[in-house]
């Protein structure tokens, strides 16, 4: 989605040379389970351990809902959820196979569609971003809103709308100055 172009500081992972069950191995495998196809994530199977609450899902603008008014598609490209066979409301944290939507943001598939180098698909080549340009933009905007010196609201709004233009693929998700609040910045951090 272009977000990888914003990486400033990353922990590099290589499926052949940095084998660990932590890092992005954990993120990709633990978020895969239920009726998900692990091949679509570029791994050999899931650990069935991570889903999100509906409150997190609701931070994204839905573009489609099912008969129960549960979101199934989103305008924001950052909303990467597996919904098939999953419930919208995660009321049982012990039940991954059906409780809550799974997040599919981290995959062992490159931006060109290539699967990682580990032939067994145990260990991903997916790098873990520690600092991204998006974080810098969000920090700038938060500092301005908290009264920090040296910044201005118009620049902060411009930075936030750059993130949203990337996320929506157009200016359709951009916000107005009146929408730029600390609560909005907190929600935007979650979406990023």
Segments predicted by a language model, with ranges:
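Elongated scaffold/linker segments in the mid-to-C-terminal portions of large proteins
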Residues: 1-137, 146
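Generic detection of long, well-ordered alpha-helical segments
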Residues: 46-47, 54-57, 153, 175, ...
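Conserved catalytic neighborhood of penicillin-recognizing serine enzymes
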Residues: 160-191
């Amino acid at each position: 989605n272009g977000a990888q172009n914003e990486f400033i500081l990353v922990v590099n992972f290589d499926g052949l040379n940095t084998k660990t069950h932590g890092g992005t191995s954990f993120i990709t495998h633990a978020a895969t389970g239920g009726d998900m196809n692990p091949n679509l994530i570029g791994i050999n199977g899931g650990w069935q351990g991570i889903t999100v609450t509906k409150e997190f899902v609701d931070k994204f603008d839905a573009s489609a809902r099912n008969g129960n008014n549960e979101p199934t598609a989103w305008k924001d490209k950052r909303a990467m959820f597996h919904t098939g066979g999953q419930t919208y409301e995660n009321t049982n944290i012990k039940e991954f196979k059906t409780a809550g939507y799974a997040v599919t943001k981290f995959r062992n598939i490159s931006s060109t569609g290539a699967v990682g180098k580990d032939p067994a698909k145990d260990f991903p080549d997916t790098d873990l971003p520690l600092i991204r340009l998006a974080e810098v933009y969000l920090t700038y905007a938060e500092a301005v809103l908290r009264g920090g010196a040296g910044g201005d609201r118009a620049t902060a709004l411009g930075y936030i709308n750059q993130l949203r233009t990337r996320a929506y693929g157009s200016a359709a998700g951009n916000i107005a100055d009146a929408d730029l609040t600390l609560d909005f910045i907190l929600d935007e951090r979650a979406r990023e």
